[in-house]
């Protein structure tokens, strides 16, 4: 949803596996036409049109459209990262952003109490913490246009392993960005440009 905030004209699809989290994604993705009405929790409800401070404006058509079918700033999709790539046409996307689970099995055993309350499926990524990165590296490059970018959040010790996975799978211009604490936190990789 942050991508849509920074790029309001972009067509954005958000994919979520968990049915519980998907319900929240749908709620957060709903919006009114062109941001009209009052916004609450990133969600514009039909009542926002009825209470808007624009008495001279006829909210009727927009309100009726919203009540009939919610308008979405992004398209929410319930899907699984391990199979969703099969639904994507080749070379149509400009950007893929993913914050996949990245904790190893050993790290899962040492979680702080507040983190341990999170669902395991949101945290655990196999024995080495790389299972989701393997899928992204192997299957998602073809969905991007040449020069399109893949942006991944990583664990602070995963820079080299994720960089190697991406390089082995034909990604180009791989770089790492640090978080405000100075830890490796994000990797950006691109589908190679077509050479003429």
Locate the predicted segments by residue.
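Mobile active-site "lid"/loop adjacent to the S-adenosyl-L-methionine
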Residues: 45, 102-131
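Conserved Class I SAM-dependent methyltransferase catalytic core
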Residues: 17, 127-190
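Structural detector for helix-capping/boundary residues
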Residues: 79, 91, 118-121, 169
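Short, solvent-exposed coil/turn segments
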Residues: 74, 116-118, 182
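Flexible, glycine-/basic-rich loop-and-beta segments that form/coincide
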Residues: 192-196
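Conserved SAM/SAH cofactor-binding pocket of Class I
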Residues: 1-37, 41-108
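Glycine-rich, phosphate-binding/catalytic loops in enzymes
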Residues: 31, 112-115, 168-169
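Residue-level signal for inorganic ion chemistry
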Residues: 3, 25, 99, 115, ...
């Amino acid at each position: 949803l942050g991508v849509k905030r920074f790029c309001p004209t972009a067509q954005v699809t958000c994919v979520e596996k968990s049915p519980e989290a998907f319900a929240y994604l749908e709620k957060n993705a709903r919006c009114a036409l062109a941001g009209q009405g009052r916004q609450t929790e990133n969600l514009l409800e039909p009542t926002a049109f009825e209470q808007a401070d624009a008495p001279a404006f006829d909210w009727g058509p927009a309100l009726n459209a919203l009540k009939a079918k919610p308008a979405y700033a992004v398209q929410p999709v319930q899907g699984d990262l391990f199979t969703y790539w099969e639904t994507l046409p080749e070379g149509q996307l400009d950007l893929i952003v993913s914050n996949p689970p990245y904790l190893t099995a050993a790290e899962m055993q040492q979680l702080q109490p507040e983190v341990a309350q999170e669902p395991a499926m949101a945290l655990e990524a196999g024995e080495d913490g790389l299972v989701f990165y393997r899928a992204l590296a192997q299957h998602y490059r073809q969905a991007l246009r040449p020069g399109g970018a893949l942006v991944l959040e990583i664990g602070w010790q995963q820079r080299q392993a994720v960089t190697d996975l991406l390089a082995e799978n034909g990604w180009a211009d791989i770089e790492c960005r640090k978080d405000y604490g100075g830890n490796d936190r994000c990797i950006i990789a691109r589908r190679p440009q077509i050479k003429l």
